[in-house]
Structure formats: structure tokens, C-alpha cells
């Protein structure tokens, strides 16, 4: 029976987290539906306003940069109707994420060392050496425990059948975890009944685990380790997150100008004099980290940092060179990596992907571009994506020209209808499409 609250709710166009296609409430959504029904739309809208006020008071924000490079600060949007994932589903997702990240770490270490996966013709070496994220200076080196990506953000979607699919791997500098943690705190404040009625899995331990992860990455044992979060600065879009994580872990938030290198050791400038730094959680891309080794124009990095890391005098997470696993061309081979390195079948499937540098697949993409989603292989944050069914003919032709000019830099995928969940709008509750970014911390079990 569809109640008054849900009478206008239409779940027929995608897999919905609350309702089946014939508008029957899913079992795991029964309790929350009863709570929402009892409150009614007016009360829910009041809670929503309280939620936004709390977000403003806590200073939760992010920056968006326009085409003219002007930054606009925005409040973090949070809808109070939660996405519910039953524990049985999450257990499978969790195992699949761990499996995937483990294989990716093994792959990165193999690429920079033995290169077995190339010799066995599982992954073509050309796609790695042509990746802008391949760092030749990392050749012959492994970080402690061979853990290259200590913090991984894996983007998941649910398709029309309700299956979880991996959409993207983010292994360089994955962002967004602070908003997840703050969302949970805000929801506990403004909607405590949800947490008394459901046995909600805790995420409060994340920053403790991140702290422990940093300690484990210190190359040499020390009684009193000093660790820092390295930020590009206050104008970075994720600066709120950088400061939040540093505060929660009780460690210093620093910019490149706060650090210096002497005798291949990293030091932090303090009022009491130089302080040796043992581990750095960096939130800068590789190219900006060290102007001596990489981009000479960088003014936000630390000259000499790479050499310190290679010599085992400082831990850096995520490790330099990890970006090769972010490449969307490499993404298409991850299922093969899982079989190759772990001898297991992938627990989580991924979206079918066409590689434009392979002629047969490129021809298919060009012929069917109006049906496909085309993505730059090495962009992030949704930049440069073309959704074929929605793009005008002129834009599609421009993308075709770009593919022909530089096929290695593009992949294409079928248009997946993302799952939906109820969202409070100005006048009603309506389904909205969504994805999910879980975070995986890799410790010594890698």
C-alpha cells in the first residue's frame, strides 16, 4: 500500500533503494518509511532546514572553480532521507572493494618492479608507459609493505537490475571522506531517531584508522613520530577536508612552504626550530610535490621531497606513482588483474568499457557515439565527459575529432541508468539518481 507521503513517488525509471518497480516498499525501508510518514512533509522540511543551518554553523563547505578560474564557495548539500544499504549487501561490497584494491596495489608494485603482468601479456605495457601518471623515477622502488595506495576511493553505481558496478577507481588523492563523516554527525544531531531504530554501522573510527595507517607507513621505527597533512593551500577545493582530517588526527596541517629538506630528511618549521617529519599525507598531485624532480614551476611542493621518500627517510601516502591505477584505460583491465594476481574471480563487476586506442573498438565508438558516454582517460571530477544521448550533434562531432587525434586519451561506456533514492525537494519527495564512493584504507595486510 502506497501511503500519502509516497503517493507521487515514481520508482519506475531506475532501480530505487526504497521501492520496487511496481511501487512496493522494500523490506529494509519499512522502518524509515514509517518514521517519515509519521513526521509528514512539513516536519521533514523543518528538519532539512535545521540540517542546513547546522552545516553552515560547522563551516562545512567546498569550492567550485569556474572556467575563468574564479572560486565560488558553496555550502555542502545534504538530504536527510538516508540511503539504506542492508548489511548483507554491504558485506559483499566490502569484500569486493578489498579484493579490488589489493589487486591494484600488487599491479602498481609490479609495474615499477618485476613487470610480470606485461611479460605474461595480461596488460599491454604501452598503455602504462603512455599514461601521464606513470612516474619513471619510481622504477625499482617499493614503499613499505608494497602498499602504494593506502587510501582508495572507489566509485560505485547500481544499474537497472540493482547490481553494484565499479564506475571508477580513485587512488591518487581521493577526496570526500570528510563530508561523509560530517554528514553522519549532522544526521545524529538533527534526526537521532534514525539511529535508535536502525543498527547503523559506525564510521567514527575512520580517522583513527587513517592515523594508524600513517604510523605504519613510517619507513623507520621511531618513538615519537611526527606526521603532517600537506595541503596546496586555502584556495584548494578540498581545503575543508584537509583541515578537518588534520584536526581529527591531531597532526599538523602544512603547506609546502612550511617544510624543507636537509641531508635528505624532511623538516617542519616551528617556533622552536626544525622538527623532523616522519610521514606525510599529501593532498597534492605528483607533479606539484617536488619542483626538483617534477614540475619545476611548482611553488606548492617541497624541493627534494622525492629523494627523501626514495631513500626511506619519510613515508608518503598515497605513494608517488600511484596514479597509473587511476587511468580509465587501466580500469578496463582490473578484472583481469584480480584473476592474475589473486587467482580469484572479481566479486564486483565493472562497467563495460571501449578503448579508443584499439581500432575496432574506436570504430564502434565513433559509429555509436550518440548512444555512449565518452570520458577522457585521465580527467577526474566529471570534467570532459560527453553523454552521447544528450549531447548536440556539434559536440559529438568535436569529441569524435578529439578521439581521432588522440585515441589513447579516451574511453567510452554504455549509458547506465543510475539507481535512485528518495530526496526532499521544495514541494515533495522525489527520486534522484546517485552513486557511492566508499573509502578503503590499506594497512600491512597488503
Predicted feature locations:
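Preference for protein termini
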Residues: 1-444
Amino acid at each position: 500500500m502506497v501511503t500519502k507521503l509516497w503517493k507521487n513517488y515514481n520508482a519506475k525509471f531506475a532501480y530505487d533503494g526504497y521501492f520496487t518497480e511496481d511501487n512496493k516498499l522494500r523490506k529494509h525501508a519499512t522502518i524509515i518509511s514509517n518514521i517519515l510518514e509519521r513526521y509528514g512533509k512539513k516536519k521533514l522540511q523543518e528538519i532539512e532546514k535545521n540540517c542546513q543551518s547546522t552545516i553552515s554553523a560547522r563551516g562545512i563547505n567546498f569550492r567550485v572553480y569556474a572556467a575563468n578560474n574564479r572560486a565560488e564557495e558553496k555550502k555542502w548539500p545534504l538530504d536527510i532521507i538516508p540511503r539504506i544499504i542492508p548489511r548483507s549487501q554491504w558485506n559483499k561490497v566490502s569484500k569486493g572493494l578489498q579484493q579490488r584494491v589489493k589487486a591494484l596495489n600488487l599491479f602498481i608494485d609490479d609495474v615499477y618492479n618485476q613487470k610480470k603482468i606485461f611479460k605474461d601479456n595480461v596488460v599491454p605495457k604501452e598503455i602504462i608507459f603512455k599514461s601521464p601518471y606513470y612516474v619513471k623515477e619510481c622504477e625499482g622502488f617499493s614503499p613499505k609493505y608494497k602498499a602504494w595506495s593506502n587510501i582508495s576511493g572507489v566509485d560505485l553505481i547500481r544499474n537497472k537490475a540493482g547490481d553494484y558496478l565499479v564506475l571508477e577507481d580513485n587512488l591518487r588523492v581521493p577526496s570526500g571522506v570528510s563530508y561523509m563523516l560530517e554528514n553522519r554527525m549532522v544526521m545524529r544531531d538533527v534526526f537521532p531517531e534514525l539511529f535508535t531504530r536502525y543498527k547503523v554501522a559506525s564510521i567514527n573510527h575512520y580517522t583513527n584508522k587513517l592515523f594508524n595507517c600513517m604510523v605504519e607507513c613510517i619507513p623507520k621505527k621511531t618513538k615519537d613520530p611526527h606526521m603532517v597533512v600537506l595541503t596546496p593551500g586555502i584556495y584548494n577545493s578540498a581545503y575543508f577536508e584537509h583541515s578537518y582530517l588534520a584536526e581529527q588526527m591531531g597532526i599538523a596541517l602544512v603547506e609546502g612552504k612550511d617544510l624543507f629538506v636537509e641531508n635528505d630528511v624532511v623538516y617542519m618549521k616551528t617556533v622552536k626550530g626544525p622538527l623532523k617529519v616522519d610521514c606525510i599525507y599529501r593532498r597534492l598531485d605528483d607533479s606539484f610535490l617536488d619542483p626538483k624532480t617534477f614540475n619545476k614551476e611548482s611553488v606548492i611542493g617541497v624541493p627534494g621531497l622525492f629523494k627523501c621518500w626514495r631513500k626511506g627517510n619519510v613515508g608518503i601516502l598515497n605513494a608517488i606513482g600511484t596514479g597509473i591505477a587511476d587511468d580509465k584505460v587501466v580500469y578496463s583491465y582490473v578484472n583481469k588483474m584480480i584473476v592474475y594476481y589473486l587467482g580469484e574471480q572479481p566479486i564486483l563487476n565493472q562497467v563495460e568499457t571501449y578503448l579508443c586506442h584499439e581500432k575496432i573498438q574506436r570504430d564502434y565508438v565513433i559509429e555509436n557515439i550518440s548512444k555512449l558516454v565518452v570520458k577522457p582517460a585521465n580527467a577526474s571530477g566529471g570534467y570532459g565527459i560527453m553523454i552521447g544521448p544528450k549531447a548536440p550533434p556539434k559536440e559529438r562531432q568535436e569529441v569524435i575529432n578529439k578521439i581521432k587525434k588522440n585515441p589513447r586519451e579516451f574511453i567510452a561506456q554504455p549509458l547506465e541508468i543510475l539507481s535512485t533514492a528518495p530526496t526532499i525537494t521544495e514541494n515533495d519527495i522525489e527520486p534522484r539518481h546517485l552513486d557511492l564512493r566508499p573509502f578503503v584504507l590499506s594497512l600491512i595486510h597488503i
